[in-house]
């Protein structure tokens, strides 16, 4: 998504929803229509003095509440534009540090143990100091134990994608002993344990009582009522932040400050996204208390070609936030020479309709 002001200055963002609603009840097809027919006309009809005002104006339209990822396809572009107007990088605009670089964090998918070891070894050799491993009940212990033996000091995060349940408590306790930084979304929300407890957040709270490792919440929190239920359990203290999921930069920033005020741990997760979205998350990693490196890795982890220039590349596990040629805003521009021949559709929405 690209926005343009009266002076021809532009800002960019990215919609990261999926083709199906497996992650959130929102799809790329729906979001395309919502951005075109609803969000773009609303934004064009408003006057903003600061990009923090955009999410508040969109919140006045109740029909948009169920489309946070669509809103996050537009709102960050206005932050990028504003950064170019005032001459500031996104990290500075949101209250982050003056850091020129951040540490990245890579993700390794589920695979045979030797393949996982090889992947982690390669990432460590590239300079990554934090790796998140996707895990499943049957192979988790073997894979994580092997990686921990190879790299005793590596910051290791585990993402179960809701694949475990209470019958695997022994496995989870053994994983806990391997000292991961957190275990993300361990429990299947549809499983009913012998105790009869059906509420997922209560179940996760009971699990947290058994582990020293933090249980981290992500896809289990979809609605405001989900958040209320989770926040009612004090020992659930770790949350993955994703800008698209919260509806843009300002809502994510608001949530970050709220969690910090409550003493919770927050860190920047990631999506199946290009360098445009990854740079937003990288900027948040400069905020106070963001002690875990974010899910920001080289664009080549997912794509043969990035959608932006300069392409998002990490060297020695580090990302330069704003290179000298792109010192403001997100720090990148769309690679239109690459995008134009690969585009399926292109729509321009203007104040003239």
Regions found by a protein language model. Give the residues of each.
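N-terminal small/glycine-rich loop or linker at the start of catalytic domains
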Residues: 85-109, 143, 152
């Amino acid at each position: 998504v690209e926005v343009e002001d009266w002076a021809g200055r532009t800002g960019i963002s990215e919609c990261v929803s999926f083709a199906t609603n497996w992650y959130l009840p929102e799809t790329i097809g729906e979001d395309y229509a919502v951005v075109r027919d609803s969000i773009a006309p609303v934004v064009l009809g408003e006057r903003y003095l600061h990009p923090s005002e955009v999410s508040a104006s969109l919140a006045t339209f109740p029909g948009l509440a169920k489309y946070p990822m669509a809103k996050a396809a537009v709102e960050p572009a206005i932050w990028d534009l504003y950064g170019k107007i005032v001459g500031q990088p996104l990290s500075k605009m949101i209250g982050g540090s003056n850091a020129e670089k951040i540490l990245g964090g890579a993700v390794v998918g589920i695979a045979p143990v030797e393949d996982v070891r090889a992947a982690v070894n390669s990432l460590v050799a590239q300079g990554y100091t934090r790796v998140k491993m996707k895990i499943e009940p049957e192979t988790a212990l073997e894979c994580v134990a092997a990686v921990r033996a190879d790299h005793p000091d590596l910051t290791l995060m585990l993402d179960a994608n809701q694949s475990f349940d209470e019958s695997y408590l022994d496995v989870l306790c053994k994983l806990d002993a391997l000292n991961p930084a957190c275990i993300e979304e361990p429990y299947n929300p549809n499983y009913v344990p012998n105790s009869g407890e059906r509420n997922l957040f209560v179940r996760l709270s009971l699990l947290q009582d058994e582990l020293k490792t933090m249980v981290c919440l992500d896809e289990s929190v979809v609605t405001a009522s989900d958040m209320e239920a989770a926040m009612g359990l004090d020992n659930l203290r770790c949350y993955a932040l994703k800008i698209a999921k919260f509806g843009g930069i300002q809502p994510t920033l608001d949530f970050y400050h709220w969690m910090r005020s409550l003493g919770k741990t927050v860190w920047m997760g990631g999506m199946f996204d290009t360098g445009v979205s990854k740079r937003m998350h990288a900027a948040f990693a400069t905020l106070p208390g963001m002690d875990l490196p974010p899910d920001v890795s080289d664009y080549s982890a997912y794509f043969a070609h990035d959608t932006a220039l300069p392409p998002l590349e990490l060297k020695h596990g580090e990302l330069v936030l704003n290179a000298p040629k792109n010192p403001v805003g997100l720090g990148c521009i769309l690679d239109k020479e690459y995008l134009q021949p690969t585009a399926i559709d292109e729509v321009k929405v203007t104040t003239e309709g």
